[in-house]
Amino acid sequence: MTVPVISVLRSTHPKIKITLLTTRFFSTLYNQIPEINFLYFEPKHKTFRGLFGLSRKINKINPDFIIDLHNVLRTKILRLFLINKFASTAVVNKGRKEKKLLIRGIKSRPLKSMHRRYAETFESLNIKINLDDFSYYKKIKITNHNYTFSSNDKLIGIAPFARHQCKEYSLNNIINFINSLDKSWQILIFGAPGNEEQKIIKLCNNKSNRHVISSNFNLEQQMAIISNLDVMISMDSANGHIASLFGIEVITIWGATHPNSGYGPLNQSKENSIVPDLNKYPDLPVTIYGSNCPADYVEAINTIKCERILERLDKII
């Protein structure tokens, strides 16, 4: 969710030199933003000693601004090691207190989006970030694949998996949904290698219009495929956020989490968020990230009828 903010920073503040600390894997997400220097977080940096070594690399850069968009224990320790006393520092306010009140039912109004929170972190250092200035990523030509799509094909991406069960539509519901789709549509199903990939193969069931997007594609290739979609149907997970970078309509299926927590994909209409029946599950959301979900809310997502998703899809396509 930091990508749009970094993109606007680059385009509206061209004189600022940007060094981004991230993993090699996630650096791919920024590949349409020019003139970014990367400092990679490696497995060896997970230890106390490793963080100290990483801080020495940052100190050599001698930054004027240090901006922590993660605000977790490791970044707090890392900041302690940074010796540049002349650097201005800002740390994202994740709104943890507000989110606790939200899941306790004390607050019901939508919270500030994380995109906005990241932008405000820069603005605390008088670096203006207007998210309306974000330019969507350009469509990427699909190469190195075994699928042939015509320009008339409707491409629908489905990302049916999530890290936690309470955020994941059941396999039976996904099967029923896919079987209800127009047979002329090309259905591209995304998932991680291993168990998820095996489930995708089952979902595809040797149908010519169903395609496995998993270990056969790296992240850069998957982004190229996503950029060509007409719509993405996603759980509360990363694929929806990636699709939103390309200006693609994203239908998000929510379970124990909720879009009011501020983690929805960029620039999507409220109607694109499909949530369980709040009359049956009045305490939603009961978790922010999907962990520590009450047992009686784990299956809330599976009370969402396929017809509701199809109705929204029909209005988009």
For the regions a language model picked out, list residue spans one by one.
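Catalytic machinery of carbohydrate-active enzymes
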Residues: M1-I317
